[in-house]
């Protein structure tokens, strides 16, 4: 609980409205709310509106949301209930359509998600739509996957082909890196990368039976090549990405790019790039060079003599996780940025598990399982689902400002920021310091607070969260960059 002057703010309750429990909004004061990227109101006095299903699809494919039937939007954008003549009949019709696979690809709702609410002696229908699990996405309409929708500040929009393909790839049980690329042969591999990998494996696991195999048999054993329909060997996607030469990787992944930038004051913008460095074409070479650079700088700065420390191990895990969970068909590349106070790691592709579950640990659902295994074989990372949880634990034990994880859309990406600033130098209050991923919690709290209060100032956010005025502005500007919030006449409001 965060104590403020005369009132107590329960951050957990505040954020509930924006992380799935949308029914926490105060429906008895519905006029306070406005339509936004998480709330949609429809009058529905003439029956179920056709646009209801576009909103259902968009909420399911984005972050979830709440649909209010029997609620009218006035000219001033305020919401007001109208009396639905027969809400039970509408709900019955709703379930008939929701369970009709010719209309809706999948029903992700439980019966508790749809109910009648009485407001001002008027009956409305509340439909709480969760974010669909990756196996169910995309949620589409009328039997056509091209009728898949997403939600942004402007409302529901039809997904692009790239967005649809990304969701389809993530929905498959077999991960995309297991695919055999029959248009290519083993000539795509960089033999220097492969031999460096084999030497590293022999150092980590000296008695591994794989060390006695020929290169061809070794590649097959680790899943880097496979037999195609022509009964010949071809590289797998994992093998191509891990050991391939960049010109061949880009034939399969046109947007493929790996980049590391160091902008510290004592380093004149060091850049390691798959486009610029011939010795850094693939995932393996990039990982080795970037990790060596990062770990050396950290040991030098902190006067650490050992090569292996909890922090360097956590950084190794973070960098490997980024490469393992990237969607290499995405339009944005892998970017690692280092400055004087932090390292930021970003990869294309959204979350495959809920963020809270990833932070708690124990659930493993990597986007590229074959690549993960290749890293595991040289002692990097684990497949127990505790990678993110372990990183948070290390940062907390070293009393550093806790990591920040953010998910962005259009294009989809995940960003992890690892700060090396001690908690004692942070402006966070002690109670907030102990909360995991507090930056994300704060953004969620701000969205919910604006939902309740329509417009806010940065000063109000500062007082709400107990942070500096400068920090509150930073949070608001991040939400503006994500297209969730806009500023009007010096006040912030949710984008309509």
Where are each of the predicted segments found?
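Conserved N-terminal catalytic/coupling substructures associated with nucleotide/phosphate chemistry
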Residues: 1-312, 317-424, 428-430, 456-458, ...
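Acidic, carboxylate-rich catalytic segments that either coordinate divalent cations
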Residues: 462, 471
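Long, low-complexity, charge-rich intrinsically disordered regions
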Residues: 430-433, 496
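A short, conserved structural fragment
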Residues: 480-490
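Short amphipathic alpha-helical interface segments
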Residues: 436-456, 463
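Minor-groove-contacting beta-hairpin "wing" of winged helix-turn-helix DNA-binding domains
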Residues: 415, 490-496
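Short basic coil micro-motifs at the edges of alpha-helical modules that engage polyanionic partners
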Residues: 307, 435-436
């Amino acid at each position: 609980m965060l104590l403020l002057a005369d009132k107590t703010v329960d951050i957990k309750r505040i954020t509930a409205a924006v992380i799935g429990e949308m029914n926490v909004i105060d429906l008895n004061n519905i006029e306070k709310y406005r339509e936004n990227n998480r709330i949609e109101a429809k009058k529905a006095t003439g029956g179920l509106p056709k646009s209801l299903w576009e909103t259902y699809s968009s909420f399911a494919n984005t972050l979830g949301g709440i649909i209010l039937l029997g609620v009218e939007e006035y000219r001033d954008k305020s919401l007001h209930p109208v009396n639905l003549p027969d809400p039970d009949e509408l709900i019955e019709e709703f379930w008939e359509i929701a369970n009709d696979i010719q209309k809706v690809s999948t029903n992700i709702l439980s019966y508790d998600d749809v109910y009648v609410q009485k407001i001002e002696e008027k009956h409305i229908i509340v439909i709480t739509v969760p974010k669909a699990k990756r196996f169910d996405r995309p949620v589409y309409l009328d039997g056509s996957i091209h009728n898949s929708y997403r939600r942004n500040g402007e409302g529901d929009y039809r997904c692009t082909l790239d967005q649809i393909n990304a969701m389809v790839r993530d929905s498959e049980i077999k991960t995309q890196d297991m695919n055999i690329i029959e248009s290519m042969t083993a000539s795509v591999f960089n033999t220097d990368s492969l031999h460096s990998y084999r030497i590293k494996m022999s150092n980590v696991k000296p008695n591994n039976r794989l060390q006695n195999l020929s290169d061809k048999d070794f590649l097959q054993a680790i899943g880097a090549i496979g037999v195609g329909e022509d009964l010949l060997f071809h590289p797998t996607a994992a093998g191509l990405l891990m050991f391939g030469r960049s010109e061949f990787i880009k034939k399969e992944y046109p947007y493929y790019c790996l980049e590391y930038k160091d902008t510290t004051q004592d380093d004149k913008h060091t850049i390691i790039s798959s486009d610029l460095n011939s010795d850094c074409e693939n995932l393996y070479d990039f990982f080795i060079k970037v990790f060596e650079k990062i770990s050396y700088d950290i040991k030098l700065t902190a006067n650490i003599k050992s090569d292996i420390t909890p922090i360097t191990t956590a950084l190794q895990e973070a960098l490997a996780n980024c490469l393992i969970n990237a969607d290499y068909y995405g339009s944005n590349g892998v970017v690692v940025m280092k400055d004087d106070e932090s390292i930021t790691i970003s990869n294309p592709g959204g979350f495959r598990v809920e963020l809270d579950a990833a932070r708690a640990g124990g659930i493993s659902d990597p986007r590229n399982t074959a690549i993960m295994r290749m890293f595991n074989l040289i002692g990097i990372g684990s497949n127990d689902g505790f990678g993110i949880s372990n990183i948070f634990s290390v940062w907390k034990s070293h009393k550093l400002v806790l990591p920040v994880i953010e998910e962005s859309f259009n294009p989809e990406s995940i960003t992890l920021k690892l700060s090396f600033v001690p908690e004692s130098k942070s402006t966070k209050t002690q109670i907030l310091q102990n909360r995991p991923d507090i930056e994300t919690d704060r953004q969620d709290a701000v969205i919910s607070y604006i939902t309740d209060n329509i417009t806010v100032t940065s000063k109000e956010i500062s007082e709400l969260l107990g942070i500096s005025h400068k920090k509150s502005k930073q949070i608001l500007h991040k939400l503006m960059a994500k297209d969730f919030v806009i500023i009007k006449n010096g006040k912030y409001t949710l984008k309509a």
